[in-house]
């Protein structure tokens, strides 16, 4: 109400004006459950007209709406009427449907949202190949398209698509998909050729990777140098054999941790891969890498005559171990820091990347094959929020196991995961999400169990079954964060803890 009162001494009576306000009802959100829809603009309560592209394989739309008023004072109606909660597209008038929100009392105050439907042609496509165990991926731009039942893709006639077919022992093939290229069964046959035969060196490897063996246990019988220390002068009779300034600084320009293969020591510094004589420190051979590493922390990995290095921006590069000729470079589409050790198993390369505490990053499987070209495609990829940092994988003859970051800042979230994959297909065999803080250690293996630590300050162990399932969880609160890979030896476990 508004009351008008005459001034003191004035004439006239007090006047009261009464206003009745009616809030214009509007929708707050509108979504549809069907996939493959494209709306011209994002929904906004004040925008009343929209264009919606709908694949012709979709026969009805399933709307979910919310209103700005939530006290039951409004009604929502559809034209045409809903049938089993769906808007029937065969009953549209002039290709349009409306959603009306009105006051529940009279229905006189209302807002009408109009959607114009544009039907888009679709077709089914399936890619077949001669390569056993091949992985097929289809992209629309940079977006991965998910296949339906039996590997059949539902594609749109107004979009362009490309395929990638990768298989162990074969040269990767990429190309475009179009409806005219399919046979009568709706299939596109992609024939892969065998990788070219090359002769690689066969070296014995004393210490081929970060942890020295496939179990990531870092156990050795080699003795450290010994000598006498003079108590008065504090001098030692142990002599420095050699020192080589192969790098500079303390970041990616520094010399990384070495591996020992075929009587040589391999390391990298800056953008150079180095092959060194361990007796003299002399550089026997060197090669340019595609970039430098992120922090020169993780050593290279050797296997089957090849040296593998993890580099900046989500890269992995492979070299011949004898003359350091580059064989191929992988570039991950999500990029990221390459701070995790590379795991090699049966001709497959596994490594993860990191894009910040909550950023999405990939764990990838690559075939080690030289394909006659420098570019390498992943056999399969797994994306995780928080990614992989210092997280080396364990692989056996069937499975590969890796730990993830928790996807959040701090060290108290119980959202870090231990994931078991089929090592060849990338299918998730088992996964647990109950670990406190980032898992930033290698996954170590001994006697049927995997061992790892977390930044939340725990030492964990799980049984890894022959079927790839995890069970028999055990944990110990260490009292401080840990990124140390455990060692299990002679009935005891050894692990480092932050002070």
Where do the protein language model's features map onto the residues?
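Repeat-blade elements of multi-bladed beta-propeller folds
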Residues: 203-211, 249-273, 291-317, 334-364, ...
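Aromatic (tryptophan-biased) beta-strands that constitute blades/sheets of beta-rich domains
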Residues: 196-254, 266, 277, 282-292, ...
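Short loop/turn and low-complexity linker motifs enriched in small/turn-promoting residues
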Residues: 119-197
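Cysteine-rich, disulfide-stabilized extracellular repeat modules
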Residues: 26-28, 83-85, 113, 121-123, ...
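Beta-rich interaction/scaffold domains
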Residues: 1-124, 130-132, 168-176, 182, ...
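Core beta-strand residues in small-molecule sensory/regulatory alpha/beta domains
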Residues: 33, 102, 137-139, 276, ...
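Short, polar loop/linker segments at the starts of domains and inter-domain junctions
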Residues: 38-51, 140-148, 217-240
